[in-house]
């Protein structure tokens, strides 16, 4: 079907690479497709590139766009795909790049170089083992080096080169715990390309800005990407929801949850306009959920129940009638993981009775992690209410549900069982504490902290309620003020003890706990801590007098 670009309902801006040579209609479709590509909506990008190919049968880059959009990217690497998904992707990629290669005779040199480089990434339609697929990624990254050397001043060439190098170690450019580059990553080359491009025209390029945020967020210095985050807030196209969301990654890491919330609200409003199209872009649903997840996280970190609860409601709406079969693909598991985060909201805000009264809505076979999270939350709530026998039964239900989660089940970038290990230790810690087994409770909560610290980086967090907040609150309740002080200082990043991505800078809960510790210790830093807390409290819509609602007399409502 031939559709005029003027009738397309979404505004993705008008940026078109300087090396695109075609008619106006094809160029408009190509520009829109490329913006969707930079915004990780590959499925919609494919449709736009197909329109470009129909508008100009000799337009080689349109077929390049189809090929690159049909293949792996940061949020969908080869190793996350099932065999049928790999077969479908490779057939599409190989076929499209062959079409592009057949049209390069009159293509500009930059376009021809991009097409020839991408061709080495998809040399056949038969799916090999993962080792060979990885070698194809290396071959493509290597092929992009001379392209970048020749044309790297062009921001689109720079963005595509940076992406090719990132894809050698997606989400693993840095070793978070060692606070150093992963030896397998081309970190030096990536950073050099980013610095060069950001010093030039890349400073106004949505792809370069997007990739800069992703690279720096995993580094020891995420604040380095603040200029890119702020510029992307200004430049993200009106209908590119994920690009509007992306600055929130950096804002959250540096503790600016007001800006993270603002980005999240904007992206969610944009995503709402696109929702009717999710039937044709099923993978993009994961990105829409991700944007909502960030608002949930920001609300939980600021003590704003309205924001967190709104996000939970929207998350449930997005996933309505979606989680209706056994999860098979990584996408299935990711969507189910997003649904599972909803259970964390009521725990964070101590809504114990609501949790205790709630029955699980859904089929446990289709929602195994959500089912386990439901029982974990009930055990914590019942223990806080002093209903210890019922808490024991809920804990047994959690153990049974956890055991039924299939081996290898993914939960974002982590294994589901590693996430549930945090919940198990946190649950048993609070249960033991409220049952009067104080030391056992602290031991379990320290194990929860250690389990959370072992998780693979993901932003926002897969486990939404930091165990340090519970541990610090209950240590304070027992008068162990100096121990609590250390917990809060580490959580807020006041010490070098924790990598940045394991800190919770600027969160109102630890600010409250640390201010209380300093005041009780007579610490001269009490004034500064109180001022920091006073600055954070206006974002909260709930009283915050402790870092966890689990603090308080067993059987009571708890305090925070």
Map each language-model feature to its residues.
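Short coil/linker segments at helix-helix boundaries
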Residues: 2-58, 63-153, 160-204, 209-219, ...
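C-terminal non-catalytic interaction modules
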Residues: 486, 490-499, 503-560
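Single-residue signature of alpha-solenoid repeat helices
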Residues: 45, 93, 140, 190, ...
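TPR-repeat structural position
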Residues: 42, 187, 222, 257, ...
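TPR/TPR-like (Sel1-like) alpha-helical repeat modules
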Residues: 60, 67-72, 83-102, 252, ...
């Amino acid at each position: 079907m031939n559709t005029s670009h003027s009738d397309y309902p979404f505004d993705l801006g008008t940026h078109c690479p300087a090396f695109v040579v075609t008619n106006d209609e094809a160029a408009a479709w190509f520009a829109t497709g490329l913006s969707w590509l930079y915004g990780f909506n590959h499925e919609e990008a494919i449709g736009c590139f197909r329109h470009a190919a129909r508008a100009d049968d000799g337009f080689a880059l349109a077929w390049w766009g189809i090929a690159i959009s049909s293949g792996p990217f940061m949020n969908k690497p080869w190793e996350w795909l099932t065999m049928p998904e790999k077969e479908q992707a490779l057939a599409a990629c190989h076929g499209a790049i062959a079409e592009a290669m057949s049209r390069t005779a009159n293509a500009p040199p930059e376009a021809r170089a991009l097409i020839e480089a991408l061709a080495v990434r998809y040399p056949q339609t038969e799916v090999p083992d993962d080792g060979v697929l990885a070698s194809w990624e290396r071959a493509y990254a290597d092929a992009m080096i001379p392209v970048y050397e020749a044309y790297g001043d062009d921001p689109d060439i720079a963005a595509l080169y940076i992406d090719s190098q990132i894809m050698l170690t997606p989400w693993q450019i840095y070793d978070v715990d060692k606070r150093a580059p992963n030896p397998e990553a081309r970190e030096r080359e990536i950073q050099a390309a980013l610095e060069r491009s950001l010093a030039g025209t890349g400073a106004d390029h949505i792809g370069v800005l997007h990739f800069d945020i992703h690279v720096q967020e995993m580094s020891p210095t995420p604040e380095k990407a603040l200029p890119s985050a702020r510029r992307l807030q200004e430049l993200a196209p009106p209908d590119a929801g994920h690009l509007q969301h992306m600055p929130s990654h950096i804002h959250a890491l540096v503790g600016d949850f007001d800006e993270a919330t603002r980005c999240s609200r904007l992206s969610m409003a944009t995503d709402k306009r696109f929702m009717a199209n999710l039937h044709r872009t099923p993978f993009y649903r994961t990105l829409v959920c991700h944007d909502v997840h960030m608002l949930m996280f920001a609300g939980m970190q600021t003590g704003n129940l309205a924001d967190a609860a709104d996000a939970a409601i929207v998350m449930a709406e997005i996933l309505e009638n979606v989680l209706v079969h056994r999860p098979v693909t990584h996408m299935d598991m990711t969507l189910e993981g997003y649904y599972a985060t909803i259970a964390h909201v009521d725990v964070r805000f101590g809504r114990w009775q609501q949790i205790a009264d709630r029955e699980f809505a859904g089929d446990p076979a289709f929602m195994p992690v959500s089912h386990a999270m439901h029982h974990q939350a009930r055990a914590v709530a019942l223990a806080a209410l002093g209903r210890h026998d019922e808490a024991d039964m809920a804990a047994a239900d959690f153990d049974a549900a956890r055991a039924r989660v299939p081996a290898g089940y993914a939960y974002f970038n982590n294994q589901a069982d590693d996430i549930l290990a945090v919940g198990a230790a946190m649950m048993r810690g609070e249960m033991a504490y409220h049952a009067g087994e104080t030391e056992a409770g602290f031991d379990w909560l320290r194990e929860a902290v250690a389990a959370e610290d072992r998780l693979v980086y993901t932003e926002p967090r897969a486990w939404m309620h930091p165990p340090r907040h519970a541990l610090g609150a209950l240590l304070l309740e027992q008068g162990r003020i100096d121990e609590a002080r250390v917990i809060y200082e580490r959580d807020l990043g006041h010490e070098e003890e924790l990598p940045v991505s394991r800190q919770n800078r600027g969160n109102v809960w630890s600010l409250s706990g640390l201010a209380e510790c300093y005041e009780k210790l007579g610490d001269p830093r009490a004034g500064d801590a109180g001022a920091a807390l006073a600055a954070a409290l206006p974002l909260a819509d709930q009283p915050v007098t402790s870092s966890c609602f689990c603090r308080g007399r067993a059987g009571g409502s708890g305090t925070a």
